[in-house]
């Protein structure tokens, strides 16, 4: 992440609607995450973290079926774009330059498929897209910046195009899971997640940026954690909990909406 953007997020985090008490985490320095960190976890193909990423991206990819030209906003190291490039004309944008350098090195068969900039600074010649994805992005942004980013992204969406967004449900058991993962892992998600949404808040957010037919569902409950007993076992659990169980107990929200004509 560039210094300017890091300062912007830090300033908005300090000035935004947070309490400012000692319980509020300090701004997170995203430059400390090694390039390709999450992509390498995905590629590992074993364990809870890898299964989490596989199931997460598979569901997003399903939602994008039938949409040819796709932009992944906050693409990080390019994992989803790499998945989509088999069936879509896929692009990624992220403000963290080292992650984009990794993405261009690993996934860009025909550069430039990835852009190191804010979504509003994308080249005009890219035009509009049939669909947008934003996977676990907005929880990392102060609310005002999240709103601006989504509005700028929707500007890049053609009329009738689709936005697919995921973010943790802080009304679910996610906060507990987050604290446990923070204690056991290398990355502190509690410090990173400064925009803590619920289904009702996410619906309002998506409608406010000009989307219609807004839906918020939930997914990812026990299945990723079942990967410690085997990859195929986790897939079986995923199929069993799909639908009612996930939508009641899922840790991650899947928000979708269509841009008005």
Residue ranges and their predicted role:
Residues 90, 163-164:
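A short hydrophobic/small-residue beta-strand
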Residues 2-127, 131-133, 147-150, 218, ...:
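Conserved N-terminal segment of class I S-adenosyl-L-methionine
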Residues 136-140:
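Short catalytic micro-motifs in class I SAM-dependent methyltransferases
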Residues 185-201:
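Acceptor-substrate binding/catalytic loop of class I
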Residues 164-184:
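Conserved class I S-adenosyl-L-methionine
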Residues 147-159:
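A short glycine-rich, Lys/Arg-flanked "PGG" loop and its adjoining helix->strand segment in the class I
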Residues 178-182, 204, 214-261:
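A C-terminal cap/extension of S-adenosyl-L-methionine-dependent methyltransferases
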